[in-house]
Amino acid sequence: MLSIRWDWGQYGDLQLGDYEKARLWIERIEEMSQEGGFLEGGARGQGGEARARNSVPLLKARYIVETEEWMVLPVTEESSNNELLATALSAAHTGDQQALRDAETSLRERSSGEGEGTGIMANEVSALLHAGMGHADVAKRFMDEAVETIEAMAPPRGSASPIKPVYELYGEILLDLGEPEEAVEKFEKSLERMPNRPRSLLGLGRASAMVGDRDKALEAYTNLTRVWAGRDSFDGYKEAMSYIHSTENN
């Protein structure tokens, strides 16, 4: 249960924009796994240390994805699937095509021998790669495959899985491809599965504003400012407030 607590705890702090506390979760788990922070024997003995060590890459990868503080990590055989996805997203946003290709290759190789979760992440990364190359139809085909897989699954009850939700990423890709109408649908679906998720609210606000749906954009941006209350320094918060103020003057 301890691993669930730090998993959900960090995720919750990230959604609220408390990035300092989210980093603290990582530091604490690293200290506990490296400096004998677990009791000898029992559930919190060696097993607890192993769970802590295995959780660190997940927490670090999630931090990169949620904060969008992009970091391209080396792609190696030891890279976890979550690290590969975080690296692929970072590479896509920073223009590192080689790192993006390397991450895609690794996830594709693993997807044939692992569960559906790896296949979903592989499709997400393939979509990022082809979207960046201007292959819109190919990118959407990969995302459609990812959607088909997750639709057979129940919505997450805790933290997002994969760490970059499929519908959210699909919406962001569609925005980049200049298809805001379709993006609106994807962000709405993302919010059905994970209500009030800030990155999906931000995407819905942007897409709705682009298609001229003022009411929907205003609702999404307003909800975002509530989730990120007090996060005045966030670019997304500033964007939301700017839109809200613009509607007050019209």
Question: Where do the language-model regions lie?
Answer:
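"A position-specific structural signal for the A-helix of alpha-solenoid helical repeats
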Residues: 8, 59, 82, 86-90, ...
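Amphipathic alpha-helical segments of tetratricopeptide repeats
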Residues: 27-38, 105-112, 144-155, 185, ...
